[in-house]
Every structure is written in C-alpha cells, then in structure tokens.
C-alpha cells in the first residue's frame, strides 16, 4: 500500500494536509471557482494511490494543467502555498499513477512559517494509454 506522507518540522497540529477531507465533488467545485474551468476529474482525495484523483481526458486541457489547477485550488482553500519537489509515475494493475511530492508552507496566526511535505496521487491512465 502506498501512503501519502506529511513531514512537519515541529508543528503537526497547526498544518492541515493539503487535501484534508475534500471529496471529489467539492474538488471539482474548488477547481471551477479558483481556476475558471470545469475539470474532468473523479475519484478520491489523492491522499493514497487507492484514493487517487482521476484525471479524465477532455480533449481541451492537458493533465499538467489539470493537476496544477487542482493543487492551486486546494492550496487557496486551505490558505497554503506549495512547490513541487518531485514526482514519479508507477504502473499498477494496468493503471498509471503519478505521485507529486509537494513542499507546503503555512503562516500561522502568530506569523510563524510552518513547513511540511505531502504526496498527492493522480490516476492519469487515460492520458498514458492514449499517448
């Protein structure tokens, strides 16, 4: 089982994981609100491979655009900023999963910057099979 992880440098209780309890229906609405397009997504919240955010081909947006729109919308919703630190693609059971490692920053109410890392999982099978 692949799990996302969140490494905090001292203040775990103050930093929420990027996706937290956001469900796919709410995620679609967040992306529409913050990015201005109706992303063709389904699945889970991306915290594990088993709950990966499924990005469907819509013939308009490439997967990177959709991934960044999702991450941007989630960050704005949680008042976080993030950077992509790395990523990988794995094929498991005929499906393709992209993991994106994020560096996350949050300024707490006292003005201190809290930092951590989290991996978000995307199912990009439709894009990989149609290459």
Residue ranges of each PLM-predicted region?
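Generic intrinsically disordered, low-complexity segments enriched for polar/acidic and small residues
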Residues: 2-8, 34, 79, 94, ...
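Amphipathic alpha-helical interaction segments
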Residues: 13, 80, 129-130
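Exposed, flexible binding/inhibitory loops of compact, secreted disulfide-stabilized domains
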Residues: 61, 81-82, 90
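Short amphipathic alpha-helical surface micro-motifs
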Residues: 35-36, 80-81, 101-105
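N-terminal trafficking/processing presequences and adjacent post-cleavage segments
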Residues: 1-72
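Short, compact, well-ordered microdomains
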Residues: 85-131
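Short secondary-structure junctions
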Residues: 73-83
């Amino acid at each position: 089982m692949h799990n996302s992880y969140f490494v905090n440098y001292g203040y775990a209780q103050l930093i929420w994981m990027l996706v937290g309890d956001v469900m796919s229906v709410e995620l679609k609405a967040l992306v529409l609100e913050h990015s201005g397009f109706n992303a063709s997504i389904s699945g889970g919240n991306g915290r594990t491979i088993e709950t990966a955010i499924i990005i469907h081909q819509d013939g308009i947006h490439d997967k990177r655009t959709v991934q960044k729109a999702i991450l941007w919308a989630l960050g704005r919703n949680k008042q976080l900023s993030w950077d992509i630190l790395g990523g990988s693609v794995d094929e498991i059971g005929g499906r393709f999963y992209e993991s994106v490692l994020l560096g996350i920053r949050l300024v707490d109410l006292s003005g201190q910057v809290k930092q951590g890392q989290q991996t978000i999982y995307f199912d990009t099978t439709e894009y990989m099979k149609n290459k």
